[in-house]
């Protein structure tokens, strides 16, 4: 059992939770809780830590999973130190990052798993800063059939603990890549036959007036400033989400969910 918060392994795990640089250098991230561990791809699980208290009350199935991964027992104090949450669940794991390619983003996890070929449905996110928004977009994206997500370098770190929690497990099933130049990527997608729609207050047509049954990508911008002009202008069309009252625009994550749900609705026929 690890009982010292000064232990080198503990310090390393703490760094993974607190520093994007540490996660990036070692190609890992942290998850908490048994539910997330169950959903993690086996080959991506690197290390597992658990408290005696959790083991004492765990089901036989959960114990089997923990021992299969060679879980290391730690004291409550150590778990509190390593965990990002205020009230840790008693299970924490170090997960290897998976390096997706653009091809995997276009193809999508769900299509690969089902063997069905559907038109790509993408989210292109520019400078999304709020971890909760980013995690929610992954989760709602999975639920609405998004095949993959393309992020600008200015977006929040997708591997931060807050983003990971917000995905509710979708982090393991939603292909994504970061790109240096979003507007250039939008243009590249156009050469691949993918129509790109920028969520924008200057849109002349409502989002539900377009056909999204063909290869489609939605562009969502920063929570406060929206899309940069360069990126918005690279899109095939501007789309507007009509609002009532004095509300000017939707939350970024809500906008993404509305647009991708409409695409999902159309594709259901």
Where are these regions (language model features)?
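Short beta->alpha connector loops at strand-helix junctions that form conserved
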Residues: 74-75, 126, 152-153, 175, ...
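Short acidic-hydrophobic, aromatic-tinged amphipathic segments that line or gate anion-handling sites
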Residues: 1-4, 70-75, 175-182
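Active-site/ligand-binding-proximal alpha/beta "capping" segment
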Residues: 197-246, 251
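RNA substrate-binding interface of SAM-dependent RNA methyltransferases
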Residues: 108-202
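Boundary-proximal intrinsically disordered activation/regulatory segments immediately upstream
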Residues: 1-59, 155-156
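Acidic/glycine-rich phosphate/pyrophosphate-binding loops and surrounding catalytic core
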Residues: 86, 90-91, 95-117, 155
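Structured adenosyl-cofactor binding patch, chiefly the S-adenosyl-L-methionine
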Residues: 143-144, 158, 163-171, 229-269
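Glycine/small-residue-rich loop that forms an oxyanion/phosphate-binding "nest" at active or ligand-binding sites
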Residues: 64-96
